[in-house]
Amino acid sequence: MTAVRAPRRRAPSDGQGGFDFSRPDEIVCGVDEAGRGPLAGPVVAAAVILDPARPIDGLDDSKVLSAKKRDLLYDLIVARSHAYCVASASVDEIDTLNILHATMLAMKRAVEGLSVLPTLAQIDGNRCPTLSVRAEAIVSGDALVPSISAASILAKVTRDRMLVDLHERFPVYGFNVHAGYGTAKHLAALREHGPCEAHRRSFAPVRAALDLIR
């Protein structure tokens, strides 16, 4: 595993990678996650192999895009990428393994779930999961590498939709608004109602809420 740090800039829309026609043996996938920080819900990862013959304009770090733009790009990525896979690690796995190892597990599942085996996985951040293919960690990769940008969008949109579904089951917490992050509203609901089965009991604010009701 290697780690690369580069100046932050917007991901270019051209030269999107995936297949390198000058090196037909090289197939690159971008990998990113969503949901390491929230107090509730799974952590989600995506892996994407872009098709250079079907470029997607506007790819960027999902965090700087509006929800409307993310939804639009999500549909384009699903339609135009050569291969993609979205995977997750559950709340139970997060609490058992810890959030770092659960994130690596979700990333591994995403890469291994691709219908096309990549020769290189480019991972957002400074750590790589253990994979059967070469892996390269790229700091700020979600803003630098289009395939990682695409993965960040798939992971973010998928997880946000999961949290909307959780809101239907547990409406008192406002998961549809904050996606499980520790906002003031969420923390107040935790103190008032205690945690639900979707909360990560290994996270300190959730443990504190549990202590209040014991």
UniProtKB/Swiss-Prot annotation:
Domain RNase H type-2: 26-214
Protein name: Ribonuclease HII
Keyword set includes Metal-binding: yes
Segment forming the signal sequence: none
A Pfam short name: RNase_HII
Provenance organism: Burkholderia cenocepacia (strain ATCC BAA-245 / DSM 16553 / LMG 16656 / NCTC 13227 / J2315 / CF5610) (Burkholderia cepacia (strain J2315))
Region (Disordered): 1-21
PANTHER family named among the record's database cross-references: RIBONUCLEASE H2 SUBUNIT A (PTHR10954), RIBONUCLEASE HII (PTHR10954:SF18)
